[in-house]
Amino acid sequence: MKNQNSTNSFIRIENSYLFSIQNVLKNKLREKYVRSLIVLGSFLCLSSSSLLANNVVIGTPTVVGGNLQFTIQWDNSWNTALGPGNYDAVWVFVKRQVCGGTQTWNHSLLSTVSGNHSVTGGVLQVDAVSDGVGVFIRRSAAGNGNIASSIVTLNLQTAANLVDNFQVFGVEMVYIPTGNFIIGDGSSQYTFNGTTITAATQAAGFANANAYQSSGHGSFGALPAAYPQGYNAFYCMKYEVSQEQYVKYLNSLTFTQQIARTNISPASATGSWPIQTASPNNARNGIRIMTPGTATTTPAIYGCDLNVNGTFNEAADGQNVACNWLSWPDLMTYLDWSGLRPMTEMEYEKVARGSGVPLVANEYVWGNTTILQATSGALTNGGQGAEVSTASGNGICAYGSANSTTFGPLRCGFAAGAATTRVQAGASYYGVMDMSGNVFEQCVGGYNFNYSSFNGLNGDGTITAAGLFNTANWPTAGGGQAGGIARGGSFNSGAPGELRLSDRNQMTNNFNQSKQSVVGGRGVRIP
């Protein structure tokens, strides 16, 4: 439930201010995507209601004059001109199901002209994007606080009607501004060599790997100007993909697509474990089949059941726990479907370290070398939206858990509270959570592979009928030696070294080519 007594404050963080996204980072419900909000044709209309997604609430969509209209509200929004000079936003996109069709949810393109969309209240603005895959909704001027319910009207490229079904999804993002920054700390394993990324390096590219890694441990091919070094502005997901977020995605796929993204047939019995099959609740993944599908015609319906009692989507069923067991193809397909894309290693370091920030040798994402262990074996309110570690202090990070089926990742953003600083919350310079520990991030990069063709093309919202991403020039297999390195460490990282911001010790490891208990991820998008 929403906390109606939230307060807002700014937190001093070295040379910057990070807005304390109080209840966004508090002990509260943390669903990452809006639950399926469906408006049905008049002769099919059953019932619908507004549903909570993290602190973002999107009301039931309705069709008004060929446009799609719904309400949006969220807590603790910010837009600050002070360092780091960024803001939060909600990435909103729409899926459409033709009434009486094949149950396929297709991506619905939106107008590419911002003026064709609107939002009431005078506080927010709608930013269209050039490919029409979605829109960003954000504050239009400097300020902070809760966003009251506002009516959003989206103009679809194909007019909405009263017989089709619509789902509106929203995910919290953080704007990462244009600016210089440093890659590498000169100390961590296989680190980049301390190069400063500037407008000039972005425009010129890198002739070879020795230009950014002293031992040449990078791309076989020269990195051209089109390769995203991180200098230019982009948006980054505030949190790692959550288990409920992944469930909502699976529930929007066809039966055939579900086969590709799970380990067992969607027609398997109720209670089957589709993401991992070794044992129930393996490494705290609580995704199960709630309603079996029918081969080739009707997809399964998945749900969360972390406490393994057979009742789905209860308060303690781990909906807000970071989703693990995501292979490179799993994450890439999810990002393509969402209209996002993978980040590069260099962008990862930009998000974590910040722009114009002095280098700290062996630093973690929160900007210093202090680290405090948190594990899923010592929790309060385990599995709930209020899940927190019993440990508290500076540099708290989910790492060091035993390699067993009972330990796993924690709730997304578990370390942040109403009055935590960046160091206490384990937050990045820009306010992005859990970039060290919890689950490995998956980034374009690594070693012994030519990933120079990656040009940062965003996903288009559409995946193949076989259930695979198909955006041009994305590395296909993943793995440190196939263009998709794992960064940031995980709940199972034994030594804190691989949790360091600039550590690249997984550059030769291809373990994320298949589902692993320690791997998850998040996406980014160019504006």
Region locations from a protein language model:
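N-terminal secretory signal peptides that target proteins for export/translocation
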Residues: 1-33
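Bacterial N-terminal signal peptides
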Residues: 36-48
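Sec/Tat signal peptide C-region and signal peptidase I cleavage site
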Residues: 49-53
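Short amphipathic, basic-aromatic surface patches that mediate peripheral association
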Residues: 71-84
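Short coil-to-beta strand junction motifs in C2/discoidin
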Residues: 82-92
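Solvent-exposed serine/threonine-rich low-complexity stretches and specific carbohydrate-binding patches
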Residues: 103-141
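Short aromatic-cysteine micro-motif
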Residues: 129-170, 195-363, 367-371, 381-433
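Disulfide-stabilized, aromatic/cysteine-rich ligand-recognition loop
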Residues: 321-322, 413-428, 458-527
